[in-house]
């Protein structure tokens, strides 16, 4: 899949934390929280992305997977490695991880109708988490799937599978706390771009397959964390 120049994504950024936060606030105003037209018909391809680090953080490892939407069958897996662009700064995860994620995206042979990213969407201090930033620069519908709360408040969902409650930030809903597996902590689900709050929840639920994480980010997480290297060897023709 081709995308615009990765170097141009941060064009004009002076590298400062202050400017990065200002850019986040500006970009957040362009986020669309309505379902993309491709989601109104039945999407056929889903993608999942996650990031890990090597060499004591000096190398960023991004994993991308492509799968069928109908049966969650894994079609492609890819891992790319790039030099880490900046140290970890709370709230600026996308500036650290996005270059690697976009490189991983270019490895996909087909364009997904919906993307799941490990991290937050609009459930973020400036409404531009990694999933929102990724969706905006790629113009792809995107959902953020996070293991921990970053911002906002929510009532703990019930203990049954599928129970969910809204995440509120300053009185506005920015996501869902979802009990994706019994006896596990809830996931933090938030729309990234070109998808509604409701659809972000329902698509995540559709992609649950007995594990805490939905399949797109679960498979990407296994690769990014090196737990899923067998997956790569199982699909040699796609790498």
Curated annotation (Swiss-Prot):
It comes from Xylella fastidiosa (strain 9a5c). It is found in: Cytoplasm. HAMAP family: Endonuclease_5. The lineage of its organism: Bacteria, Pseudomonadati, Pseudomonadota, Gammaproteobacteria, Lysobacterales. This is Endonuclease V. The record marks 88 as: Interaction with target DNA. It catalyses: Endonucleolytic cleavage at apurinic or apyrimidinic sites to products with a 5'-phosphate. Keywords: Cytoplasm, DNA damage, DNA repair, Endonuclease, Hydrolase, Magnesium, Metal-binding, Nuclease. It is an enzyme of class 3 (hydrolase). Its main location: cytoplasm. Belongs to the endonuclease V family. Mg(2+) binds at residues 50, 118. GO terms for biological process: DNA repair. One of its GO terms (cellular component) is cytoplasm. DNA repair enzyme involved in the repair of deaminated bases. Selectively cleaves double-stranded DNA at the second phosphodiester bond 3' to a deoxyinosine leaving behind the intact lesion on the nicked DNA. GO terms for molecular function: deoxyribonuclease V activity; magnesium ion binding; RNA endonuclease activity, producing 5'-phosphomonoesters; single-stranded RNA binding. Its EC number is 3.1.21.7. Its cofactor is Mg(2+).
């Amino acid at each position: 899949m081709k995308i615009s120049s990765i170097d141009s994504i941060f064009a004009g950024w002076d590298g400062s934390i202050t400017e990065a936060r200002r850019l986040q606030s500006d970009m957040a105003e362009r986020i669309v929280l309505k379902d993309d037209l491709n989601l109104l018909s039945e999407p056929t391809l889903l993608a999942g992305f996650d990031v890990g680090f090597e060499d004591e953080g000096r190398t960023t490892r991004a994993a991308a997977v492509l799968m069928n939407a109908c049966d969650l069958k894994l079609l492609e897996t890819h891992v790319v490695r790039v030099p880490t662009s900046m140290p970890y700064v709370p709230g600026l995860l996308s500036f650290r991880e996005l270059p690697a994620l976009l490189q991983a995206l270019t490895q996909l042979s087909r364009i997904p109708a919906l993307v799941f990213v490990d991290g937050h969407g609009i459930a973020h201090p400036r409404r531009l988490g990694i999933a929102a930033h990724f969706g905006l620069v790629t113009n792809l519908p995107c959902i953020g799937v996070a293991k921990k709360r970053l911002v906002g408040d929510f009532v703990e969902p019930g203990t049954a599978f599928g129970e969910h409650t809204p995440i509120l930030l300053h009185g506005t809903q920015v996501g869902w706390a979802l009990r994706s597996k019994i006896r596990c902590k809830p996931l933090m689900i938030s729309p990234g771009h070109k998808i509604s709050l409701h659809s972000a929840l329902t698509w995540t639920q559709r992609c649950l397959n007995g594990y805490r994480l939905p399949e797109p980010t679960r498979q990407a997480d296994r690769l990014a964390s090196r737990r899923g290297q067998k997956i790569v060897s199982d699909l040699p023709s796609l790498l």
